Amino acid sequence: MKSLIANRLATFFTAICLSALVVPAAAQVPQPPEVAARAYLLLDVTANQILASKDLDMAVEPASLTKLMSAYLVFDALRSKKLDLKQTLPVSERAWKMPGSRMFIDPKMQVPVEDLIKGMIVQSGNDATMALAEGVGGSAERFVQMMNDQAKALGMKNTGYKNPEGLTEAGHTTTARDLSILATRLMSDFPDYVGFYAIKKYRYPGTPAANDNNRNLLLFRDPTVDGLKTGFTDAAGYCMVATAKRDFPNLGVAGTPGGGRRLLSIVLGTANENARANESQKLLYWGFTAFEAIKLFEADQAVVTADVWKGKQPHVRLGRSQAMVVAVPAGTAAKLKTQVVRTDPLVAPLAKGQTLGTVKVMAGEQLVTEVPLVALDAVEQAGVLGRAWDAIRLWIR
């Protein structure tokens, strides 16, 4: 009976303590600037912490931010060798006649995939996006289904796509939170291709001269900004997902992509092109100056070593598979301390990567964040005699 009660208490303890991923700072954080947008979000990508937000789960029209998901599927096709950058794709009548922003391709052309990607990202070309969608999915309709399937797989719970390019359509909506999930996964999953988002100017040979500059004005203002995408429709307003990476020698961890500290800002529904750039720049500046990123533990470093019952090994190391980085208000690093909360007792078998506890990061008495701790090694179940002996020890414990 005592063992049964202990096991049930352990299960309950695990359920209430270990279900969350990284949570944002609890209180007394620096006040964010006033942001003139319907919704916004600032994420410290390196620490995986939301630093500031407004209406992050409000349904909004994404406009050309839709093309982030279209690019995700194109990059996935490149990675799986279903597409090649030098491969050419035809331009259908449907792609040619797409309204809105264009790269000005026509049905007489066979356009390399690499150029279509540049047209989609730099020029925000709806024609390029449609040509890629048809090339990857076989049809736009099939591609849209792939977009929705991928959104579900990524955990984008409040997103629904109706087209590949982002033109206004009933039910074509997303949220700032879902866009942050998509943007971070786009960068981490496809580091070989996200460089397309830093291209400042592009025009496909033989097409008429137009505004060939990337609509992300921050690329021209801030050398640390290297993406990602803008969008506009009358319904959506002016929107932007921007990201910047700054090197911090004392941090020494991998950002996304490359080293240093990376922030991601999302502003939705601003008044004009300059406003979306200004509000994004304001958020990024505040995030880099009001917070600092601190590396507490290396990847695969044991935060704590815990006893294991009924296992072939008597102990298991708990830690993180990636370096543990936290974002804290500037000037509070000296006050940081950690507190480990873990399932007890730990009973084998235990799988490598299994969540078994949390580490709380405190600044004085204030909770900054808490992060899951996982088993860094697998522990197999002991033999019959070993399990029986530990069962007795647990009973009298």
Where on the chain are the PLM-derived regions?
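N-terminal secretory signal peptides that target proteins for export/translocation
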Residues: 1-6
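Low-complexity intrinsically disordered segments
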Residues: 8-11, 253
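Bacterial N-terminal signal peptides
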Residues: 10-21
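Sterically constrained small-residue positions within well-ordered secondary structures
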Residues: 18, 31-33, 53, 256, ...
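Bacterial Sec-dependent signal peptides at the C-terminal "C-region" and cleavage site
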Residues: 20-29, 374
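Active-site-adjacent loops and short helices of periplasmic peptidoglycan-processing enzymes
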Residues: 25-191
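Domain-terminus/edge residues, biased toward the C-terminal soluble/receptor-binding domains
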Residues: 157, 168-173, 177-397
